[in-house]
């Protein structure tokens, strides 16, 4: 991280200088400073930073404004909140920042010490280094998304899900990316909003991704009947009455048993027409597809859906998993979600696992499976296949 670029945002000069000194002693050479949110936004607009330390309480455009700007800018570097506010405020701010899809590493309370900064930098160094340029892409319009669909620019990416105890890959989640004419990788947060505005667009996009993923999956693993493949399905897609029949037909045409397919129902799947959505989910279930409730804990009606529909799987949202070691509320949500699912006979998958310590916490809580950068980032199937054939080395465990 010697050549990394870090921005320190704080209205107190002594804090900025203290942080800069600590970072310099840790080998960081490229350090920028801003004394308020406005200066920070100007720097962020013209520089690429690997990490940003940001205060909350500043007189000219506070830290919340900076976080909002980072979210709109699709910033993928590390974000560290620094403040003298009470722990509950810091924890809530972290959760808010994750709604912007920001990579919150932690909260640092003032006064700042070298030991605290060293711990933060050590954490950052352990994490995969995302490609900021790849995700710094504005939101596409419906017309632009239609162009990419017509030009066959969609690519199916996959992220493995591992059994937390054996470290064997038990399934894959199919994700979608766009690779444009200039080989620029465009992430879903830049085009899903446009797709969700049109029932036709989101259906077309979903079907294209499913077809591409099934083709790759069937070719790469023709005899792996125990390996599951999961798809994200939104409410607008489920409102199409013909979708279950289409899915059954396309899966069968690839020679894949429906029991290998998991339909991950996102929170948006709960909103448009609850009765229609429930009926469609039951149709999928009767066709022998497995059902998963995605991003559990983030929606107002998640528990009601869990009661109403015979789900096979519950996925704990990454916002709770990420800080379950530092946020008592997140830890409680994770533990109680697992306990509830177990009582109902439902498998539990944790999203967003990035460290061994978080993995250990989940194991002790009884979580079945997990996915995240600790194991593998999403990628084309030919890049993921080797991990499936070679289990991740398991640590010695006493539990």
Residue ranges and their predicted role:
Residues 13-32:
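Two-component/phosphorelay signaling modules centered on CheY-like receiver
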Residues 47-53, 79-80, 311:
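Active-site beta3 strand of CheY-like receiver
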Residues 10, 55, 317:
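Active-site residues of response regulator receiver
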Residues 2, 85, 107-118, 235-237, ...:
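EAL-family c-di-GMP phosphodiesterase catalytic domain
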Residues 141-255:
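Bacterial c-di-GMP phosphodiesterase EAL domain
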Residues 65-68, 72, 85-106, 360:
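Alpha4 helix (beta4-alpha4-beta5 surface) of REC/receiver domains from two-component response regulators
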Residues 58, 180, 306:
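Receiver (REC) domain active-site loop signature in two-component systems and cognate sites
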Residues 33-42, 63:
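Helix N-cap/capping motif at the beta->alpha junctions
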């Amino acid at each position: 991280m010697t050549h990394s670029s870090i921005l320190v945002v704080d209205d107190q000069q002594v804090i900025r200088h203290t942080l800069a000194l600590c970072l310099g002693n840790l080998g960081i050479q490229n350090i920028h400073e801003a004394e308020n949110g406005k200066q920070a936004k100007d720097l962020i607009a013209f520089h690429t930073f690997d990490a940003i330390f940001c205060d909350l309480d500043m007189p000219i455009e506070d830290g919340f404004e900076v976080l909002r700007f980072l979210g709109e800018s699709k910033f993928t570097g590390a974000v560290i909140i620094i403040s003298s506010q009470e722990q509950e405020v810091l924890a809530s701010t972290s959760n808010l920042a994750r709604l912007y899809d920001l990579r919150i590493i932690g909260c640092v309370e003032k006064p700042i010490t070298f030991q605290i900064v060293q711990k933060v930098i050590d954490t950052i160094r352990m994490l995969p280094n995302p490609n900021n340029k790849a995700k710094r892409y504005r939101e596409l319009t419906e017309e632009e998304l239609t162009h990419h669909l017509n030009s066959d620019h969609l690519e199916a990416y996959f992220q493995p899900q591992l059994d937390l105890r054996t470290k064997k890959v038990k399934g894959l989640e199919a994700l979608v990316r766009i690779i444009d004419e200039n080989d620029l990788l465009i992430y879903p947060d830049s085009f899903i909003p446009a797709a969700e505005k049109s029932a036709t667009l989101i259906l077309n996009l979903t079907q294209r991704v499913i077809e591409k993923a099934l083709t790759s999956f069937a070719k790469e693993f023709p005899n792996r009947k125990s390996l599951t493949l999961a798809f994200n399905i939104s409410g607008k897609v489920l409102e199409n009455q013909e979708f279950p029949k289409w899915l059954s037909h396309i899966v069968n045409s690839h020679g894949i048993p429906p029991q290998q397919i998991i339909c991950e129902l996102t929170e948006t799947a709960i909103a448009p027409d609850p009765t229609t959505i429930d009926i469609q989910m039951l149709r999928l279930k009767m066709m022998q597809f497995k059902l998963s409730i995605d991003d559990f804990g983030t929606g107002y009606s998640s528990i009601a859906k869990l009661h109403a529909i015979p789900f096979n799987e519950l996925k704990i949202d990454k916002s709770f998993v990420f800080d379950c070691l530092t946020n008592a509320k997140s830890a409680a949500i994770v533990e109680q979600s697992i306990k509830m699912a177990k009582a109902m006979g439902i498998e539990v998958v944790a999203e967003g696992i990035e460290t061994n310590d978080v993995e250990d916490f989940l194991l002790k809580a009884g979580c079945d499976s997990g996915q995240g950068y600790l194991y593998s980032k999403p990628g084309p199937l030919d890049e993921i296949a080797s991990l499936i054939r070679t289990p991740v080395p398991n640590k010695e465990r006493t539990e």
